[in-house]
A protein has these predicted regions:
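Short loop/turn segments that flank or connect secondary-structure elements
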Residues: 1-177
Length: 177
């Protein structure tokens, strides 16, 4: 499993990677330019086939950086249409954000994904970066030892984490600020 902290932010597909029949980003993200809310298929998407206006994509679509596409070491089972969530590196803070298909809200909690997300979180925390999974605007912070619900959030909201020590050893707490 690759470590996102070692991944160079790029919008270019890794060698051998292509969207193919994957169109999940066309469902899970809001597209304000097209007045498309999150969680519903874009009217220009042919699910499982691709975009019908690919030559005239909105800027948000052209600039999107699907982590599976840009990280050639990420296993094939992490391709968004298989995993049922889309991971990306948020350019402003380097966090890994996942947007979950509302038709499969617990997909990221299944094997091998939850353990992989926790491994990413462990690698990123030393860099003060984090992994957040979103179902719509409900955010869950993935920590090395657990998943912490943060409630409704946007990419502009902030949170604070702290390590605490208990009878089972160190763990984490998070709070919105």
């Amino acid at each position: 499993m690759p470590v996102p902290g070692a991944t160079v932010m790029t919008y270019a597909a890794a060698p051998g990677r292509a969207c193919g029949s994957c169109t999940l980003c066309c469902k899970v993200y809001a597209l304000p330019q097209l007045e498309k809310p999150p969680g519903v298929w874009c009217g220009h998407c042919a699910p499982g086939q691709g975009c019908k206006i690919h030559d005239a994509l909105p800027e948000q679509c052209r600039r999107f950086n699907c982590l599976w596409m840009t990280d050639g070491k990420m296993p094939d089972e992490w391709r968004p249409d298989r995993a049922k969530f889309v991971l990306s590196l948020y350019p402003e803070n380097g966090f890994v954000y996942g947007q979950v298909d509302p038709g499969s809200p617990a997909a990221w909690r299944r094997a091998p994904y939850f353990d992989g997300l926790r491994a990413m979180a462990k690698a990123l925390i030393a860099e003060r970066r984090h992994v957040l999974m979103f179902l719509g605007d409900d955010a869950t912070l993935i920590m090395p030892d657990q998943a912490l619900s943060l409630g409704k959030m946007t990419t502009r909201d902030n949170f604070r984490i702290e390590q605490v020590f208990g009878p089972q050893g160190p763990t984490w707490r998070a709070a919105r600020i």
